[in-house]
Amino acid sequence: MELQFLGTGAGQPAKQRNVSSLALKLLDEINEVWMFDCGEGTQRQILETTIKPRKIRKIFITHLHGDHIFGLPGFLSSRSFQASEEQTDLDIYGPIGIKTYVLTSLKVSGARVPYQIHFHEFDDKSLGKIMETDKFVVYAERLAHTIFCMGYRVVQKDLEGTLDAEALKAAGVPFGPLFGKIKNGQDVELEDGRLICAKDYISAPKKGKIITIIGDTRKTSASVKLAKDADVLVHESTYGKGDERIARNHGHSTNMQAAQIAHEAGAKRLLLNHVSARFLGRDCRQMEKDAATIFENVKMVQDLEEVII
């Protein structure tokens, strides 16, 4: 499981940072990639990665500001050509209005996509658990931005315990159907009368990962709720230390506020993104150091950076 940041800037493209988009790579888990936001130029950023567009099966939009959605029509059109050998349907999750935006853009431009797009739109009344599969659950809450904006919490369901094959061999259990029964939790009796208890040969379930992705927002308790005990919290950091007033006025957060959220939520790791173009390399390093005074395990991410979860 990996996160790859396709765009880490705020507002408009800059020389060092493109606008918002990140990919959650779940290739080992379900052979899919989930994208969060799709700002202008996202498909160009994807070309710099190993991501195959047809593997992107779900897109989660935080809100409808242009720096988070202007890349969608182009990406959806290009996905048609790049997925010509294997067309795969696509689910788009986001605030009410995302369906109208996408379909209008495709209609006006005369674009046709040879795959199905399934839209899932949300407002205040329909948030909470918004999606569930056999391996993942996704939750969403409203944040505190200048327009309706959502944050997402991706929860991997606990992984089944693994079978200790070597211990079974040592116990004289013949390889074959009995292994399968024990793996499924069944106790088995051997020919010599010994009872093999499945629980003695299966490890405890492994807790699944939690990834929280916070869209544009002021400091809010909703972010703490979404980030509770998260393995990774991705939080916007449009502004720096001392910019709290301007951040609040524009519906954004500072690096220090993001660190406070991570601390209050008990998150394990904080990744700062959505950085104003006025902050260059040295500034970003200082923002990271400042945030670390509140939450130590923090990193300011760069475009195309990959983070293993």
Curated annotation (Swiss-Prot):
Its cofactor is Zn(2+). Zn(2+) 2 binds at residues 67-68, 216, 274. It catalyses: Endonucleolytic cleavage of RNA, removing extra 3' nucleotides from tRNA precursor, generating 3' termini of tRNAs. A 3'-hydroxy group is left at the tRNA terminus and a 5'-phosphoryl group is left at the trailer molecule. Disulfide bonds: none annotated. Binds 2 Zn(2+) ions. The active site is at residue 67. Pfam families: Lactamase_B. Zn(2+) 1 binds at residues 63, 65, 145, 216. Gene3D superfamilies: Ribonuclease Z/Hydroxyacylglutathione hydrolase-like. GO terms for molecular function: 3'-tRNA processing endoribonuclease activity; zinc ion binding. InterPro entries: Metallo-B-lactamas, RibonucZ/Hydroxyglut_hydro, RNase_Z/BN. Keywords: Endonuclease, Hydrolase, Metal-binding, Nuclease, tRNA processing, Zinc. Its EC number is 3.1.26.11. It is an enzyme of class 3 (hydrolase). It comes from the Bacteria. SUPFAM superfamilies: Metallo-hydrolase/oxidoreductase. Homodimer. NCBIfam families: PRK00055.1-3, RNase_Z. HAMAP family: RNase_Z_BN. Belongs to the RNase Z family. Zinc phosphodiesterase, which displays some tRNA 3'-processing endonuclease activity. Probably involved in tRNA maturation, by removing a 3'-trailer from precursor tRNA. This is Ribonuclease Z. It comes from Streptococcus pyogenes serotype M5 (strain Manfredo). The lineage of its organism: Bacteria, Bacillati, Bacillota, Bacilli, Lactobacillales.
